[in-house]
């Protein structure tokens, strides 16, 4: 009887019950689970580094994109930008619209002069979705050092924090229900720019 019961139990288990855990958001060693133009992206000492140095990048922004789509999540990391006019960001609930250049459309948690902590609509009508308060950014920003940055996305609600201070906290009803996450390198003139994302922590919210 015990043998028969065990056989029945195994037979009833779906293949999903034996499936491996999903791949980590970022494994800290490689760009497994991510896609982009290889010349611009690498992993250094556990950090994602994007660089357009020394030639810059003209004509379009480019992105390192997750191969998975995500709905609700929390993402935190430290970011440092180098280079005159350096600008970057993290796309949320977005989509790739040009796979050859890895051009992306959707909401972006922005980083760079005049945009730190804002929610920007990359290739969306109207551009800026919600500006961060300039006085709050000025009070906490470390322009030449690593800054703590966090993004929480639940339903249509987005919260962005810079060095612990809330910069955006609101509902965005036109935002898609799911999409990719992507790290941005903004188009820049020579000698280009560099963005380093380290201490990356990610949690899906079920």
Residue ranges and their predicted role:
Residues 1-4:
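Positively charged n-region of N-terminal signal peptides that target proteins for export
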Residues 7-16:
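Bacterial N-terminal signal peptides
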Residues 18-206:
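Carbohydrate-interacting regions of secretory-pathway proteins
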């Amino acid at each position: 009887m015990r043998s028969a019961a065990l056989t029945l139990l195994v037979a009833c288990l779906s293949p999903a019950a034996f499936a491996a855990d999903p791949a980590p958001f970022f494994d800290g060693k490689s760009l497994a689970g991510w896609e982009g133009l290889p010349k611009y992206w690498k992993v250094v000492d556990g950090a994602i580094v994007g660089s357009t140095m020394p030639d810059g990048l003209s004509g379009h922004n480019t992105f390192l994109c997750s191969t998975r789509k995500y709905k609700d999540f929390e993402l935190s990391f430290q970011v440092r930008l180098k280079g005159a006019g350096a600008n970057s960001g993290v796309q949320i609930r977005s989509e790739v619209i040009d796979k050859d250049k890895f051009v992306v459309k959707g909401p972006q948690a922005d980083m760079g002069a005049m945009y730190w902590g804002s929610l920007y609509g990359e290739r969306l009508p109207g551009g800026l979705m919600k500006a961060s308060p300039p006085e709050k950014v000025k009070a906490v920003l470390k322009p030449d050092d690593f800054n703590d940055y966090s993004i929480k996305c639940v339903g249509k609600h987005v919260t962005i924090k810079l060095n612990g201070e809330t910069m955006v906290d609101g509902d965005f009803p036109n935002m898609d229900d799911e999409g990719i996450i992507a790290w941005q390198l903004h188009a820049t003139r020579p000698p280009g720019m560099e963005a380093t994302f380290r201490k990356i922590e990610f949690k899906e919210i079920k």
